[in-house]
Amino acid sequence: MIIVTGGAGFIGSNIVKALNDKGITDILVVDNLKDGTKFVNLVDLDIADYMDKEDFLIQIMAGEEFGDVEAIFHEGACSSTTEWDGKYMMDNNYQYSKELLHYCLEREIPFLYASSAATYGGRTSDFIESREYEKPLNVYGYSKFLFDEYVRQILPEANSQIVGFRYFNVYGPREGHKGSMASVAFHLNTQLNKGESPKLFEGSENFKRDFVYVGDVADVNLWFLENGVSGIFNLGTGRAESFQAVADATLAYHKKGQIEYIPFPDKLKGRYQAFTQADLTNLRAAGYDKPFKTVAEGVMEYMAWLNRDA
């Protein structure tokens, strides 16, 4: 069995899909379906069982067994960069992750987990997986950074695989439940389909991010499980492309629309990553050599998926 925490969420459900594509269906999905809309991410996927996150954590802390577990993909976390409840964030992201990590170490179960590019904070260059480059801007980034630091202490003595992925700006299918935290491509598509003008912040040609397609993210996760490599790795494309490029690709698919530029909100000033670009040196050195989709390629594929029933 493979366990996917956050398996009804964005990246988790895409990992489930990637496993299904390889014929793997003996999957336990762990999630919190208090947000009932997330179930739609699983309706076209095949899993063996579902468990609520709280019940799962109780069983993990009690040392209960789940049968023959081949790996745990730990994607379950609070991923809102605008959540400032530090106790909630540390319980949900840091303590929960530590419990799972030790459960896996004791049983030598491969543990593959979601870190984040938010660990780098407001950098504009040198997004390198090393302590001197890490200075998170928000409590979400701090919770991810602290767990990475914890893992670094354990890695040298670990007898089983531990791998963390610093996801950059992931977009693609199955993110609709994320609301305001969904990608720009998702929001632009929604606005266009409502007959509204698609909106970007003023200066969007200067805001550049490493936008990585979720299908590529799932592929990297599965490659690492198959190859047993440990460590903490950036997971982006290695390219910085502008929000304007995302909008251009969206409009190219729809063949209509005119961008409306809106003022940059005061509440995000100083807390907003204006530039991200993954340094892929370590990922490539680990042996992962597949290409990543460009914004033009990924957004076109995503638009086709979003509008598949149109």
From Swiss-Prot:
It catalyses: ADP-D-glycero-beta-D-manno-heptose = ADP-L-glycero-beta-D-manno-heptose. SUPFAM superfamilies: NAD(P)-binding Rossmann-fold domains. Substrate binds at N169, S180, H187, F201, E202, G203, S204, R209, Y272. Keywords: Acetylation, Carbohydrate metabolism, Isomerase, NADP. Its EC number is 5.1.3.20. Binds 1 NADP(+) per subunit. The active site is at Y140 (proton acceptor), K178 (proton acceptor). Its cofactor is NADP(+). Disulfide bonds: none annotated. It comes from the Bacteria. Homopentamer. HAMAP family: Heptose_epimerase (MF_01601). Belongs to the NAD(P)-dependent epimerase/dehydratase family. HldD subfamily. Catalyzes the interconversion between ADP-D-glycero-beta-D-manno-heptose and ADP-L-glycero-beta-D-manno-heptose via an epimerization at carbon 6 of the heptose. This is ADP-L-glycero-D-manno-heptose-6-epimerase. It comes from Escherichia coli O9:H4 (strain HS). The gene is hldD.
